[in-house]
Regions:
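Sec-dependent signal peptide hydrophobic core
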Residues: 6-16
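Short, surface-exposed ligand- or partner-binding patches at beta-edge/loop junctions that are enriched
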Residues: 72
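Rhodanese-like catalytic fold shared by cysteine-dependent sulfurtransferases
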Residues: 2-7, 27-28, 35-67, 77-116
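Hydrophobic h-region of N-terminal signal peptides that target proteins for export
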Residues: 15-23
Length: 116
């Protein structure tokens, strides 16, 4: 189980934690930006669900309510709204990673070309 992280100060420890969760399929990364934004690049292995549709679309991923979910957008605002929406429907381990560049750095992942 992961607890909310309010300040990302120790990037190497956080990156190690995220990498461990992602490699063991205990976590998922979701890009909540618009499709137009995602076409400019997406973090490798992330899935795309626009923040306005997250409450409805999250069900197609068949996630457990306690599974770790890492969200990002352009600046952290929309991923913050998506975080609240997911918590309101019962997800307990949701983390807003902020903007795409910070999220990629924190996760130690590349930004790659989006393919549908």
């Amino acid at each position: 189980m992961i607890h909310k992280i309010t300040a990302l100060k120790n990037f190497s420890l956080i990156t190690l934690l995220f990498s461990s969760l992602l490699s063991s399929n205990q976590a998922i990364v979701i890009d909540v930006r618009s499709l137009e934004e995602v076409k400019t690049g997406i973090i490798e292995s992330a899935v795309h669900i626009e923040w306005t549709e997250i409450s409805e679309e999250i069900n197609r991923l068949n996630l457990q309510k306690e599974q770790s979910i890492f969200l990002y957008c352009r600046s952290g605002n929309r991923s913050g709204k998506a975080e609240i929406a997911l918590e309101n429907i019962g997800f307990t381990n949701v983390v807003n990673l902020g903007g795409i560049k910070d999220a990629a750095k924190t996760l130690d992942k590349k930004i790659v070309e989006y393919s549908e």
